[in-house]
């Protein structure tokens, strides 16, 4: 007769590890044996997967997750949700947070939520709040966090020591950061106000996406841009498979990055692509991803490969705005490339602004922003790391490439664009920076925090399935497509300077279309 199995109480970290193993194809039976638990417990963990991940993602401490064994809720759950949302936003924005500030805010939310009874945000309540959400420290110095030069020096020294201990090369050190992009915002003679575009018909919310760029410290490995739009399948995509897009596309009802999307990106895109790159360079498959404290970035314990060799590390909130590499001109250069590219396309097509504006779709924008990211030079990225890793900038200083596109270059394009000849330098600069302060994550007002804490749906949650774009439906049959490839091949043959690979690509495309045409005829 077998003895009774000893009761095992798993930590939150254990549950996260089990979830990862289940996602990678592990069986409930095997995991039950490994962790000394029943299969029912494993199934319960699978069932509560999202709740566990959300809880861990909002935690401030990996070490506390390794100790904490329950997700015991607060007796004031709505207040707890509101306070956590508020706390994460304040930390991300670099605002000072202290015990008294938290207590005052908790009292405000308690009454704003219409909760009954007396509430005393005592030191005991604050301690329990920190424990519930694995927050290491809530008291951050009472000065504005966005300019702490001493903290910058301390972090940089500690980070360099960390890199040396882990034996990491610049090729193994990455940074990712989100930003909002008003993809259909064009300059006009009317003044451009930061955060709003004045071109007739522009809808800043509808025509905004979140973009996340990620590259290593050498700038030699740039991952495809991660783009978050509102619609799962925008009309402009038509039959385009999202896997074939020049970006990694995700959807969210407000076109914001969120915890779930970031985790998917990390597990399914970042980790595999980094492994592949490091393997190609003959380097150990080990890397660190440096992040800021955005509310959409999960806990370090969640952002970790199965073998623990690829992981995330966070910039302290009081230094992120000063040294985050992507914010040191990388994102700004990409956006400038994008907008200059739009103007150049308009110029080459010979359209007036109104016609170009009407035809521009999200799909067009994705190809253009991908091109803009490709045009960001490795040296631009490596220089952005000079505050954290001076040796990287020195190593890359031999790159004597031409400078990135300037405001003067964009102004020169404007001079040849009908309807934009008189745009002032001031308006041009405002247009180029119109979304420079867009964070890429949703910043909630107090009233929005309250509605969310009460479980009320956002007004913007409707119609998330399909994005409205005025695109004329057009059906192109196989015969027409085949004729176009024939014409294009004739053109390439006439051009003496066209290289052989270009012609081979078109010939391959022609063969594919012919096969499709034959299959269609045989099925009729």
From Swiss-Prot:
<dbReference type="InterPro" id="IPR050863">
    <property type="entry name" value="CenT-Element_Derived"/>
</dbReference>
<dbReference type="Pfam" id="PF04218">
    <property type="entry name" value="CENP-B_N"/>
</dbReference>
<keyword id="KW-0238">DNA-binding</keyword>
<dbReference type="InterPro" id="IPR004875">
    <property type="entry name" value="DDE_SF_endonuclease_dom"/>
</dbReference>
<dbReference type="GO" id="GO:0007417">
    <property type="term" value="P:central nervous system development"/>
</dbReference>
<feature type="DNA-binding region" description="H-T-H motif">
    <location>
        <begin position="28"/>
        <end position="48"/>
    </location>
</feature>
<feature type="domain" description="HTH CENPB-type">
    <location>
        <begin position="67"/>
        <end position="139"/>
    </location>
</feature>
<dbReference type="InterPro" id="IPR007889">
    <property type="entry name" value="HTH_Psq"/>
</dbReference>
<dbReference type="Pfam" id="PF03221">
    <property type="entry name" value="HTH_Tnp_Tc5"/>
</dbReference>
<dbReference type="InterPro" id="IPR036397">
    <property type="entry name" value="RNaseH_sf"/>
</dbReference>
<feature type="DNA-binding region" description="H-T-H motif">
    <location>
        <begin position="100"/>
        <end position="132"/>
    </location>
</feature>
<dbReference type="GO" id="GO:0003677">
    <property type="term" value="F:DNA binding"/>
</dbReference>
<protein>
    <recommendedName>
        <fullName>Jerky protein homolog-like</fullName>
    </recommendedName>
</protein>
<comment type="similarity">
    <text>Belongs to the tigger transposable element derived protein family.</text>
</comment>
<dbReference type="GO" id="GO:0005634">
    <property type="term" value="C:nucleus"/>
</dbReference>
<dbReference type="InterPro" id="IPR009057">
    <property type="entry name" value="Homeodomain-like_sf"/>
</dbReference>
<feature type="domain" description="HTH psq-type">
    <location>
        <begin position="1"/>
        <end position="52"/>
    </location>
</feature>
<dbReference type="Pfam" id="PF03184">
    <property type="entry name" value="DDE_1"/>
</dbReference>
<keyword id="KW-0539">Nucleus</keyword>
<dbReference type="InterPro" id="IPR006600">
    <property type="entry name" value="HTH_CenpB_DNA-bd_dom"/>
</dbReference>
<feature type="domain" description="DDE-1">
    <location>
        <begin position="168"/>
        <end position="385"/>
    </location>
</feature>
């Amino acid at each position: 007769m077998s003895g009774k199995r000893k009761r095992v109480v798993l930590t939150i970290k254990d549950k996260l590890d089990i979830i990862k193993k289940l996602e990678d194809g592990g069986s409930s039976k095997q995991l039950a044996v490994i962790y000394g638990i029943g299969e029912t417990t494993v199934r319960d963990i699978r069932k509560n997967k999202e709740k566990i991940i959300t809880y861990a993602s909002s935690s401030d401490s990996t070490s506390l997750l390794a100790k904490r064994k329950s997700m015991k809720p607060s007796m004031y759950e709505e207040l707890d949700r509101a306070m956590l949302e508020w706390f994460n936003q304040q930390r991300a924005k670099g605002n000072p947070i202290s015990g008294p500030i938290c207590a005052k805010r908790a009292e405000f939310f308690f009454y704003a939520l219409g909760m009954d009874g007396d509430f005393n945000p005592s030191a005991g309540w604050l301690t329990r709040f920190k424990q519930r959400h694995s927050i290491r420290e809530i008291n951050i110095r009472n000065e504005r966090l966005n300019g702490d030069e001493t903290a910058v020096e301390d972090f940089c020294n500690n980070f360099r020591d960390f890199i040396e201990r882990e034996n990491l090369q610049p090729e193994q050190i990455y940074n990712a950061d989100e930003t909002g992009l008003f993809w259909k915002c064009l300059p006009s003679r009317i003044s451009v106000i930061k955060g709003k575009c004045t071109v007739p018909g522009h809808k800043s919310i509808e025509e905004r996406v979140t973009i996340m760029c990620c590259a290593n410290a050498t700038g030699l490995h740039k991952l495809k841009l991660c783009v978050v739009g509102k619609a799962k399948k925008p009309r402009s995509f038509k039959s385009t498979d999202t896997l074939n897009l020049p970006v990694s596309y995700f959807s969210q009802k407000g076109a914001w990055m969120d915890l779930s999307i970031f985790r998917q990106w990390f597990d399914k895109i970042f980790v595999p692509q980094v492994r592949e790159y490091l393997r190609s360079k003959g380097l150990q498959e080990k890397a660190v991803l440096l992040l800021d404290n955005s509310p959409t970035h999960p806990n370090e314990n969640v952002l970790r490969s199965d073998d623990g060799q690829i992981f995330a590390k966070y910039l302290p909130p009081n230094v992120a705005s000063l040294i985050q590499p992507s914010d040191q001109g990388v994102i700004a250069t990409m956006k400038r490339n994008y907008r200059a590219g739009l103007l150049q396309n308009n110029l080459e097509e010979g359209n007036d602004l109104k016609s170009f504006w009407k035809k521009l779709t999200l799909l067009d924008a994705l190809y253009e922003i991908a091109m803009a990211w490709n045009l960001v030079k490795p040296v631009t990225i490596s220089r952005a790391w000079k505050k954290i890793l001076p040796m990287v900038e020195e190593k890359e200083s031999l790159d004597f490439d031409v400078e990135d596109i300037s405001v003067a270059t964009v102004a020169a394009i404007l001079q040849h664009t009908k309807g934009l000849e008189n745009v002032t330098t001031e308006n041009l600069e405002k247009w180029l920076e119109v979304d420079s302060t867009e964070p890429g994550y949703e910043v909630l007002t107090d009233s929005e925090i309250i509605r969310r804490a009460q479980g009320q749906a956002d007004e913007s949650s409707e119609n998330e399935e399909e994005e409205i774009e005025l695109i004329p439906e057009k059906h192109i049959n196989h015969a027409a497509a085949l004729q176009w490839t024939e014409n294009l091949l004739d053109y390439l043959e006439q051009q003496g300077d066209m290289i052989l690979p270009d012609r081979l690509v078109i010939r391959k495309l022609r063969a594919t279309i012919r096969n499709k045409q034959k299959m269609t005829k045989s099925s009729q």
